[in-house]
Amino acid sequence: MTDTEKFPPEKNLPAGYVPPKVWTWEPGNGGAFASINRPVAGATHVKDLPVGKHPLQLYSQGTPNGVKVTIMLEELLAAGHSDAEYDAWLIRIGDGNQFGSGFVEVNPNSKIPALMDHRPKDGGKPLRVFESGSILVYLAEKFGAFLPTEARARTEALNWLFWQMGSAPFLGGGFGHFYAYAPIKIEYAINRYAMEVKRQMDVLNRHLAENEYMAGSTYTIADMAIWPWYGRLALKDAYGDAGDFLSVDEYEHVQRWTKQVGERTGVKRGFMVNRTSGDPSSQLLERHDASDFETKTQDKFGGDPAAKA
């Protein structure tokens, strides 16, 4: 049976669509994200990155992956690690800032978050760190915090960190895209990814029924990685009405953990940094000093998303 017989073109979306022998890129590919997706890597324009006064320079936006790192940095500061002071520069991914030459030098994959450590432990030249999971591990090891040193506990924390790294694309790029962002609603795609996300939520719920935090009784980078993705979903603060669609209230242990983690000062502050949507009082477009949380949130500038960025 040929593919045409197996998958009649008239039943495809759009009707009559048949994949070509060789795919070619068109600028409109990607729907709502067409302006930030392309099939090649590298810089599109020359632009240096700003550098502030602190050794740690973060270039990011308040997406779930970006929030992981700002939560970690704020948790380190709350725990007394004063050397974790940082500058957080806003990279507007919708405007293509991540394709500037300076950003590509820090992360050749052109994705946020990206970190430059101008005071690495080896005393050498500034060190780039990219991929959110890598940044979390790097900071945990640099400051000796939020990642257990005992082998079994460390392994469990890393198990769940990498669970998040592997699972979240199904939540965001899969379910979130087809449920909230795709130009048309495709029943097959939504059903496929809704099933997977509910399975993931059940994995978390069963685990958290027996554990206070992801790695047991201790709060770690695993919690920081998972909360911005699955905690926000549990709070019905992701992908429109997806929380109701997925019946997230039924995951009682995820709900308990979500609220417990969300009450932490480091989480509250980290959630605000580089945030460009939501209540203006929760948006701190850039963070260069601890006092910025009191003086530079967007409500202080009339809620203008372009102000002070």
Give the positions of each predicted feature.
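Residue-level signal for nonpolar/aromatic packing positions in well-ordered secondary structure
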Residues: L115, I135, L204, D223, ...
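Short, mixed-charge aromatic SLiMs
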Residues: N97, W160-Q164, E250-G266
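Acidic/histidine-enriched, glycine/proline-rich intrinsically disordered or flexible terminal extensions
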Residues: R275-A309
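Alpha-helical packing segments of well-folded alpha/beta enzyme cores
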Residues: N65, V69, Y193-H207, W229, ...
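Cytochrome P450 catalytic-domain "roof"
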Residues: R206-M214
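GST-like domain detector, emphasizing the conserved glutathione-binding G-site
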Residues: M1-N191, M195-K198, K296-A309
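GST superfamily/GST-like fold recognition
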Residues: L171-G176, M214-G243, S247-R256, Q260-V261, ...
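Active-site rim elements
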Residues: G124, E187-A194, E212-Y213, D241-V248
